[in-house]
Amino acid sequence: MALQNLTPAPGSTHATKRLGRGQGSGNGKTAGKGNKGQRARKGYNEKRGFEGGQQPLQRRLPKVGFTSKFEKPYVINVEKITAIKELSEITVATIASVHKISKSVTKIKLIGVSAKELASKVKDENVSVSGSK
Protein backbone atom coordinates (compact mmCIF):
# COMPACT_ATOMS: atom_id res chain seq x y z
CA MET A 1 0.00 0.00 0.00
CA ALA A 2 1.40 3.38 -1.03
CA LEU A 3 0.19 6.91 -0.35
CA GLN A 4 -0.75 7.50 -3.99
CA ASN A 5 -2.93 4.35 -4.04
CA LEU A 6 -5.18 5.33 -1.12
CA THR A 7 -8.85 5.83 -1.97
CA PRO A 8 -11.82 6.74 0.21
CA ALA A 9 -14.10 3.94 1.41
CA PRO A 10 -16.93 3.11 -1.00
CA GLY A 11 -20.03 5.21 -0.30
CA SER A 12 -18.17 7.69 1.90
CA THR A 13 -17.93 10.42 -0.76
CA HIS A 14 -20.76 12.18 -2.56
CA ALA A 15 -20.85 14.14 -5.80
CA THR A 16 -20.99 17.92 -5.22
CA LYS A 17 -24.30 19.68 -5.88
CA ARG A 18 -24.01 21.62 -9.13
CA LEU A 19 -26.29 24.57 -8.41
CA GLY A 20 -28.27 26.36 -11.12
CA ARG A 21 -27.70 23.70 -13.79
CA GLY A 22 -31.26 22.94 -14.94
CA GLN A 23 -34.49 21.70 -13.39
CA GLY A 24 -33.52 18.04 -13.61
CA SER A 25 -30.70 18.51 -11.10
CA GLY A 26 -33.13 19.46 -8.33
CA ASN A 27 -31.11 22.62 -7.73
CA GLY A 28 -31.79 24.51 -10.97
CA LYS A 29 -33.20 28.02 -11.58
CA THR A 30 -32.95 29.55 -8.08
CA ALA A 31 -30.09 27.21 -7.08
CA GLY A 32 -31.78 26.13 -3.84
CA LYS A 33 -32.12 29.72 -2.58
CA GLY A 34 -35.90 30.04 -2.89
CA ASN A 35 -37.65 33.03 -4.45
CA LYS A 36 -36.49 36.57 -3.67
CA GLY A 37 -35.49 37.94 -0.29
CA GLN A 38 -32.24 38.95 1.34
CA ARG A 39 -30.89 35.40 1.52
CA ALA A 40 -31.46 34.84 -2.21
CA ARG A 41 -29.19 37.73 -3.24
CA LYS A 42 -25.58 37.29 -4.24
CA GLY A 43 -22.91 38.07 -1.67
CA TYR A 44 -25.25 37.39 1.24
CA ASN A 45 -23.67 36.17 4.45
CA GLU A 46 -25.29 36.20 7.87
CA LYS A 47 -23.57 37.87 10.82
CA ARG A 48 -22.33 35.60 13.59
CA GLY A 49 -25.05 35.27 16.22
CA PHE A 50 -27.79 36.62 13.91
CA GLU A 51 -31.17 35.14 14.83
CA GLY A 52 -33.42 36.52 12.12
CA GLY A 53 -34.22 39.81 13.84
CA GLN A 54 -34.80 38.27 17.27
CA GLN A 55 -32.55 39.76 19.97
CA PRO A 56 -29.37 37.63 19.84
CA LEU A 57 -28.44 35.49 22.84
CA GLN A 58 -25.27 37.48 23.60
CA ARG A 59 -27.39 40.66 23.88
CA ARG A 60 -30.17 39.03 25.91
CA LEU A 61 -27.85 37.83 28.66
CA PRO A 62 -26.49 40.31 31.24
CA LYS A 63 -22.89 41.44 31.30
CA VAL A 64 -20.92 39.68 34.03
CA GLY A 65 -17.99 40.90 36.11
CA PHE A 66 -14.84 42.69 35.07
CA THR A 67 -11.10 42.06 34.88
CA SER A 68 -9.08 43.64 37.66
CA LYS A 69 -5.96 45.55 36.63
CA PHE A 70 -4.21 44.41 39.80
CA GLU A 71 -2.27 41.16 39.97
CA LYS A 72 -3.64 38.45 42.25
CA PRO A 73 -1.07 37.12 44.71
CA TYR A 74 0.02 33.48 44.65
CA VAL A 75 -1.50 31.95 47.79
CA ILE A 76 0.51 29.45 49.87
CA ASN A 77 -0.88 27.62 52.91
CA VAL A 78 1.91 27.56 55.52
CA GLU A 79 0.38 24.49 57.20
CA LYS A 80 0.95 22.42 54.05
CA ILE A 81 4.53 23.59 53.38
CA THR A 82 6.39 23.34 56.69
CA ALA A 83 9.76 24.26 55.12
CA ILE A 84 8.65 27.91 55.01
CA LYS A 85 8.53 27.99 58.83
CA GLU A 86 12.25 27.11 59.04
CA LEU A 87 13.39 30.01 56.80
CA SER A 88 15.35 32.78 58.58
CA GLU A 89 13.92 35.50 56.35
CA ILE A 90 10.99 35.28 53.96
CA THR A 91 11.21 36.73 50.44
CA VAL A 92 9.87 35.63 47.06
CA ALA A 93 13.29 34.13 46.24
CA THR A 94 13.59 32.13 49.49
CA ILE A 95 10.06 30.77 49.15
CA ALA A 96 10.87 29.76 45.55
CA SER A 97 13.87 27.80 46.86
CA VAL A 98 11.72 25.60 49.15
CA HIS A 99 8.44 25.53 47.17
CA LYS A 100 8.13 25.10 43.40
CA ILE A 101 6.49 28.23 41.98
CA SER A 102 6.44 29.77 38.51
CA LYS A 103 9.04 32.41 37.61
CA SER A 104 6.20 34.74 36.64
CA VAL A 105 4.96 34.90 40.27
CA THR A 106 5.85 38.28 41.77
CA LYS A 107 3.47 38.52 44.74
CA ILE A 108 2.90 35.86 47.39
CA LYS A 109 0.37 35.66 50.22
CA LEU A 110 0.94 33.29 53.13
CA ILE A 111 -2.19 31.92 54.79
CA GLY A 112 -2.84 29.51 57.63
CA VAL A 113 -3.14 29.45 61.42
CA SER A 114 0.61 29.83 62.02
CA ALA A 115 1.08 32.44 59.25
CA LYS A 116 0.87 35.35 61.74
CA GLU A 117 3.94 34.03 63.56
CA LEU A 118 5.96 34.46 60.34
CA ALA A 119 5.06 38.16 59.91
CA SER A 120 8.27 39.29 61.66
CA LYS A 121 10.43 37.19 59.27
CA VAL A 122 8.97 38.76 56.10
CA LYS A 123 11.64 40.96 54.46
CA ASP A 124 9.99 41.53 51.08
CA GLU A 125 7.16 43.94 50.22
CA ASN A 126 5.88 41.40 47.67
CA VAL A 127 5.18 38.83 50.40
CA SER A 128 2.16 39.39 52.64
CA VAL A 129 0.78 37.40 55.55
CA SER A 130 -2.94 36.94 56.15
CA GLY A 131 -4.29 38.77 59.20
CA SER A 132 -0.95 40.44 60.00
CA LYS A 133 -2.18 44.04 59.84
Swiss-Prot record:
Keywords in alphabetical order: Ribonucleoprotein, Ribosomal protein, RNA-binding, rRNA-binding
Regions of compositional bias (Gly residues) in chain numbering: 21-35
Top-rank taxon: Bacteria
GO biological process: translation
Residues spanning the membrane: none
GO molecular function: rRNA binding; structural constituent of ribosome
PANTHER family recorded: 50S RIBOSOMAL PROTEIN L15 (PTHR12934), LARGE RIBOSOMAL SUBUNIT PROTEIN UL15M (PTHR12934:SF11)
Functional note: Binds to the 23S rRNA.
UniProt subunit comment: Part of the 50S ribosomal subunit.
The protein's name in its UniProt record: Large ribosomal subunit protein uL15
Gene name linked to the record: rplO
